[in-house]
Amino acid sequence: MMLFVWTTGLLLLATARGNEVCYSHLGCFSDEKPWAGTLQRPVKSLPASPESINTRFLLYTNENPNNYQLITATDPATIKASNFNLHRKTRFVIHGFIDNGEKDWLTDICKRMFQVEKVNCICVDWQGGSLAIYSQAVQNIRVVGAEVAYLVQVLSDQLGYKPGNVHMIGHSLGAHTAAEAGRRLKGLVGRITGLDPAEPCFQDTPEEVRLDPSDAMFVDVIHTDIAPIIPSFGFGMSQKVGHMDFFPNGGKEMPGCEKNIISTIVDVNGFLEGITSLAACNHMRSYQYYSSSILNPDGFLGYPCASYEEFQKDGCFPCPAEGCPKMGHYADQFQGKANGVEKTYFLNTGDSDNFPRWRYKVSVTLSGEKELSGDIKIALFGRNGNSKQYEIFKGSLKPDARYTHDIDVDLNVGEIQKVKFLWHNNGINLLQPKLGASQITVQSGEYGTKYNFCSSNTVQEDVLQSLSPC
């Protein structure tokens, strides 16, 4: 259904309803270029009225984490009567197309924030404008962005709250909504996080139409669905539009999104949610990664690299001297370390059960009497826990040869205390040959710390060999 509405909204051609419409506290909106009548936006239309969109600001704080307080910019008394705290950072969470501000994913982000910080968390509900056909929803976000900007302006003018303390987090169309708000506030907003910004009607458009680095003092972006809308039905932008752009898993296919329709529907509550999750799984991963990053800051390190292909070939490791940024909630800790805009970072994640990953480079030197065909695996044992086995190499196993591979481990094992080695023979060998690891070096990605382990033993296939620090 979501797929149908998106594509229908792009292809329908409508007649112009006028050149401009104005609203008292929001200003005027035109249907002239670049807002409409372009190659990317063939539909000539104006945004719906503020009354029909009915943008609502749902305030959650550490004092009311479960029940929102409705605040309005046109009635500042509602803000003063609420738990809004002028001494805290304010984070807006803005949904996208055919979504609403009371969905669990928005409130879950707020609740996770409350576990790590004192914050004003405002979920922006604009379902009155998001449930339109896509081309109309694209226009409606201009009004929603204006409403967000107006609220921030009221906070500043009447309560002395600084826009630099505002962070806007927007998914899909919500990312461009945040951009509209930031543009109206002259880029004085502290931060905008774009969660897979919507591609249709925004890719390759002028900066004033879409998210770009000038919309806030710091703009970070997570790309999870960058395949083109035609023919791949990718909903997210491939274009780099932030100071820092993260491409987890290369930005196209997210682990766990390959499920068949039955298993996807079983995993969620309700048939409609199941269909939506299937059609937009990659697109939705962006806000799931962000939410997970709040409680797992070190599990989403982004490595600077020219391409995902180079990253996958064990390049771009470890982090450079200035370190690696953390994708998601803590990306702004790297602000100022990465000069310029459109800096590109790559990382891998897990599937729907466990997203964070910790990257290590493992080098194994073999010992034995003869060359064999098979595979070698290792497991890490650290102060914080033990990893499962990870394959390092498969093919011709030669004594004294060194095999190196980067692995993405599903937990932070901490300081590594020992390593276990396992090999398997792909052929039939009645002589029961032995093979071992004479040395294994493990390097962590974040700090480049190296751990060296040695052994003089060899073992038969499928028998664990334990290596201790050299």
From Swiss-Prot:
GO biological process, one term: galactolipid catabolic process
Domain PLAT residues, every copy: 358-470
Disulphide bridges, residue numbers: C22-C28, C110-C121, C257-C281, C305-C316, C319-C324, C454-C470
Keywords carried by this UniProt record: Calcium, Cell projection, Cytoplasmic vesicle, Disulfide bond, Glycoprotein, Hydrolase, Lipid degradation, Lipid metabolism, Membrane, Metal-binding, Secreted, Signal
Region of interest (Required for galactolipase activity), residue spans: 94-106, 258-280
UniProt EC number: 3.1.1.26, 3.1.1.3
Pfam families (alphabetical): Lipase (PF00151), PLAT (PF01477)
CDD domains associated with the record: Pancreat_lipase_like (cd00707), PLAT_PL (cd01759)
Protein name per its UniProtKB record: Pancreatic lipase-related protein 2
Gene: PNLIPRP2
